[in-house]
Amino acid sequence: MKILEERIWNRIVKYTELQGTSGQEHFVRQAFRQDLSPLVDEVVQNGLGGLYGIRHSQDATAPRIMFDAHMDEVGFVVTQITSRGMLVVAPVGGWNPYTVSAERFTLFTQIGRAHV
């Protein structure tokens, strides 16, 4: 694999392995801010938590380029823990009920501790 292709692939793997269920995108935002900061003059966070970078140019005719992606992913929220220790969950986003049983999940506590 060429060096550039490998760098791009590694970045894709990095971002897709970060946890970012809707409303809990802080891990993705933090990683993106860290990677974006050295490439731009300023990083701005909007009111919804989205990030964008601005790189100023002395050339008024310089092209304007935008790369866009969403940071969140579908997940679940625990709504109940039964007396037998079973977790009752509600979906956050759209899950395919036929494939969800084959997925791996990471459980985050209210204080942010992860349990795989």
Question: Residues of each region from the PLM?
Answer:
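N-terminal hydrophobic/helix-forming segments and targeting peptides
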Residues: M1-H115
